């Protein structure tokens, strides 16, 4: 298992390039809108109708003990089926996760397959990364998921989310949105839990 972790974590040099891509934006903190507003519910319903899509961009997982940088490609082909690819700067796949229903399969960069009913735990064991997969898909799309503690910006979109699960408190910050789309979808988000940070920069969204 440790050798698998070393193989997966050998990856992804061009850190400075990806950190630039994932760099923080400073947004003016205007007073947010109410989560009970009609405009938010209309936006939420419009996003929830999107069940087939693809998004790609830059991924960074940062902690005191390790740093991981990658390109990512998330393909959602049904409400309960998706594929997540992490690739290195040369375009080679370092990790592929396929989730269908409760069954998850991971293929590492050596072609070794792992199957589990807990994708997040499997990724943690193989790579050392803690990723809240059960809510990540919702948060990536600008939805609160299971969280009930969240704030909106002045455009009736998510600005912050707070969520506790299994003793871990996640804080999600929305830094930018793709304003050319309707409904508007996130372009840059950051998740933090303790000393761990996950940065996601969605370069594009393709809605099918």
Curated annotation (Swiss-Prot):
It is found in: Cell outer membrane. One of its GO terms (cellular component) is cell outer membrane. A lipid is attached at residue 22 (N-palmitoyl cysteine). Coiled coil: none annotated. It is a lipid-anchor. The keyword Cell division does not apply. Residues 1-21 form the signal peptide. Pfam families: LolB (PF03550). GO terms for biological process: lipoprotein localization to outer membrane; protein transport. Its main location: membrane. A lipid is attached at residue 22 (S-diacylglycerol cysteine). Belongs to the LolB family. Monomer. Plays a critical role in the incorporation of lipoproteins in the outer membrane after they are released by the LolA protein. This is Outer-membrane lipoprotein LolB.
């Amino acid at each position: 298992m440790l050798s698998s972790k070393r193989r997966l974590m050998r990856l992804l040099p061009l850190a400075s390039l990806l950190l630039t891509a994932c760099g923080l934006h400073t947004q003016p903190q205007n007073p947010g809108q109410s989560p009970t507003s009609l405009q938010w519910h209309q936006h939420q319903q419009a996003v929830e109708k999107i069940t087939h899509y693809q998004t790609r961009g830059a991924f960074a997982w940062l902690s005191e003990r390790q740093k991981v940088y990658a390109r990512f490609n998330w393909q959602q082909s049904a409400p309960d089926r998706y594929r997540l690819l992490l690739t290195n700067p040369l375009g080679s796949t370092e990790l592929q996760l396929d989730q269908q229903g409760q069954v998850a399969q991971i293929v590492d960069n050596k072609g070794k397959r792992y199957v589990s009913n807990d994708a997040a735990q499997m990724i943690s064991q193989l790579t050392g990364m803690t990723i809240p997969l059960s809510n990540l898909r919702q948060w990536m799309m600008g939805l609160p998921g299971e969280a009930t503690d969240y704030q909106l910006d002045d455009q009736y979109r998510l600005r912050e989310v707070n969520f506790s699960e299994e003793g871990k408190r996640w804080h999600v910050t929305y830094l930018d949105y793709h304003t050319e789309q309707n409904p508007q979808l996130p372009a840059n988000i950051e998740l933090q839990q303790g000393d761990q940070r996950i940065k996601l920069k969605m370069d594009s969204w393709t809605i099918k």
